[in-house]
Each structure stands twice: as C-alpha cells, then as structure tokens.
Regions:
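Short, charged/polar low-complexity linear motifs in solvent-exposed/disordered segments
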Residues: 29-31, 90, 100-102, 159-162
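Conserved beta-strand -> loop -> alpha-helix junction used to position metal-binding or nucleic-acid-contacting
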Residues: 46-114, 125-126, 130
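Intrinsic-disorder/low-complexity, polar/charged segments
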Residues: 20-24, 56-57, 94, 154, ...
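Residue-level signal for alpha-helical context at structural boundaries
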Residues: 26-27, 98-101, 120
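Acidic/histidine-rich catalytic cores and adjacent linkers
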Residues: 50-51, 107-217
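Short, flexible coil/linker segments at or flanking structured domains
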Residues: 34, 65-67, 189-192
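RNase H-like nuclease fold core
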Residues: 1-46, 52-54, 61
C-alpha cells in the first residue's frame, strides 16, 4: 500500500499492489495532473519514507513526480524507525526513552516560541502568587509537554549537530540492560545501521524559509 497525503493530513490517493513499487508512476503522475487541472502550485517539498536521495544525485521520487521540481526530504519518523533494527526488541523497558532521546537529537525547539511560552506562564504564576516572581526551576515546572508541543515550533538541527548528538546517544546506551540483563542495543547491528543512516542526515534538513506549521486558534 502506498499513500500520498497533503499538508492537511488528507489522503489524496493510494494504490494497493501485489509487488513493491508497482503502479507508482501512474499514482504520482495522477497527482501531478490533478494539481495542474485545478491550478494549484506544485508542493515545495515532498516527504518520503524511502528513496529520498540517490548516488546519481537525482532521487527516484523526483522522477516519479516529473516535471515538478519539489525538494525531497526523508520523513523523520521513518528515519528513527530504522534504528529499531539495531535494538534487541521494541518491548525493552528502555525503548521509549531511547526513541524520545533520538527525537531530541534530530529536533530543537524554537527558542523565541519557548521564551514567549515562559513569559505567559510567568504571568500566570505571578497572578496566582501575589505578584511573586518564580524561579527558573519553578517556571519550567509549570510548563507541560503538551503545552510546549502546542505553542512551540520545532525545527531540524544542522547535519553535524545531529551526527554529534546521535553518536553521543549511542555511546551512552551501548551497555544498558534491563533487570534481566537483556541489552537494549545489538552492538554489531547498530554500528551498521548508524554507518548507513549518516548519509541521510542531509535529507532530514528543513528546506530554508518553508513554513511547516499551520497557525490555529
């Protein structure tokens, strides 16, 4: 099953085939034709789960959507899922923690948004504490993860920052085990996964100037 969706989460088309890759050209060209017929501009970027880049320099996705000149990027969720191959099991007690830290290696919070949220929470604190100023620790404790996701944007870190942080994360988890002694990471497999995936760090970069968030009330 291959699906194509838009920025609003709507599925524009899908194809179910008996073999991987079959029918994709007709699927993609159908979308190109529909955009052209209604006078809609081609998308600035296409996010994919594979084939984001090529040794020849031209992604197969670019060829499928010809003549569009949209940038092609690798979806971060699918990038992170590739690291599961280097773990002993997804049922390991430390699996969730590893995934959360891996996400933090890829994304950073917009500091202007974070500062705006902190100022709003500071005002709430002072209103409910007779005007007293909260400490930084108290202020941060009032911000829930849900509030931060709702009010603050994230963006991808630079290639070298991602490389450095993921390398540091892997170094920190090599020897971690659960209470039975089961390791979180399979050393040999994870070494190979990381070696291969480093070439895709450029594919995770947000296109310059592209607005990836929709403002809601």
């Amino acid at each position: 099953m291959t699906n194509i969706g838009n920025e609003f989460g709507q599925v524009l088309n899908s194809v179910l085939t008996t073999g991987e890759g079959a029918g994709l050209e007709e699927l993609c060209q159908g979308i190109v034709t529909r955009y052209k017929n209604v006078g809609k501009d081609e998308p600035e970027v296409i996010y994919v789960d594979r084939d984001c880049c090529s040794q020849s320099g031209v992604s197969s996705v670019t060829k499928l959507f010809h003549p569009w000149r949209s940038a092609v990027r690798l979806d971060s969720f699918h990038f992170m899922r590739r690291f599961n191959c280097g773990l002993t099991t997804e049922h390991h007690p430390l699996y969730g923690t590893f995934c959360a830290k891996l996400s933090s290696c890829i994304f950073e919070w917009d500091q202007e948004d974070v500062q705006g949220l902190k100022e709003a929470k500071r005002g709430e604190w002072k209103s409910s504490h007779s005007g007293h100023e909260p400490t930084e620790e108290q202020l941060l404790a009032t911000i829930t993860s849900g509030e931060q996701r709702r009010h603050c944007r994230r963006r991808s870190r630079g290639v070298e920052d991602i490389r450095r942080m993921i390398s540091g994360l892997l170094e920190s988890v090599w020897e971690l085990t659960d209470t039975t002694g089961l390791r979180l990471v399979n050393h040999d497999t994870m070494h190979h996964v990381w070696e291969v995936q480093q070439k895709h760090l450029e594919c995770l970069q947000d296109p310059p100037g592209l607005k990836l968030y929709t403002k809601v009330v």
